[in-house]
Amino acid sequence: MSDTNMLALAVETYQRLFPEIKQRIRKEPDLSPAKTQVVPIPRIDEILDMIQPLPPQTCLIGTCADGVPFLLNLTGMETGSLLVTGDPGCGKTHHLQVMAESTIHINSPHEVQIAVITRDPDEWASLLKKPGYSRHFSGVYGWFEQGATDLINQLVTLGESRGSGRHPGATVLLLVDDLPDIFEADYEIQNGLHWLLENGLFSGIRVAASMDARFCPTNPFWVDTFRTFLIGKIESDATAQSLGLDGVGSTKDLMPQVEFSAYTGENWSKYRLPVN
C-alpha cells in the first residue's frame, strides 16, 4: 500500500473511531466479546510505524480488537478535557503514559509540549530517561511541589495571552495523574486548574486527568468540566451507573491495565492499551 493510501486509511480510521464528541450523554456501551479475532497488542512505536505518516497534533488512545489504532486530535475542540476513570489498579496512569509516549512519537517538541502533575513523579521517571524524550516535557511535578503551582499559573497566563492573540507556539498536553490530590491543594492551584479544564483548549492547552470512579459522584465541581470519559474496569455496577453517563453499563469485565471503553459517536466501544 502506498504512503498516500496508508495516510488516507489512518485519517478514515480516526474519523470513524473517534469523531468529535458533542455531548456527555451516551448510548449503551458494547462490552460483549469481540466477534473478530483479537490481535495481540504491539508496542506503541510498532502500531504507529504501520500507518506512518500520521497527522500531526494527534496521540494514540489505544487499539481496537483488530489492531486498528484509536487516535485523538489534540486540538479538537468538541472532545473537551478527558477524564480517565475506573477502579484503583485499572490502568489509569498507564493510559496517561500511553498518551504521552505516543505524542512524542508523532509530534516534534516544537509542535507539542507535555506537562505532568502527579502524586508520584517516580512513576514517570522512566519516560524522561528515554533518549530524546526530555525535550518534549516542560516538567513533571508532584502535587506537593511548588513546581506544580508554578506550572498551573504559567499555563493560565499562557492561555490568557493566547486568548488575546499573543504567544502562539506548541500545543500543551497537560496530564494530571490522580486528580483528587488537588482537593488538598491551595485555592490558587485549584482555581487555575479548573480554569484550564474549562478553557484550556481554546488556547491550545489540552488537559487529560485521572480519577478513581468512586470519587466522581461526590465531586461534580470537577467532573462536570470533562466532556470525554475513558472508562476502565469498575467492579461495582452501582459505581459505574453513578457516573451519570447514559448508557454506561457493566464495566466489570474490562481487563485491568489493558481494556477501557469510550464513546465513539454512536456507541460505547472497548479498546486496548498498547505496551509502552
Tell what function each PLM region has.
Residues E235-N276:
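Conserved P-loop NTPase
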Residues K22, R26-D30, A34-Q37:
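All-alpha RGS (Regulator of G-protein Signaling) helical domain and cognate RGS-like helical scaffolds
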Residues N5-E20, V38-I234, A238, T251, ...:
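P-loop NTPase catalytic phosphate-binding loop
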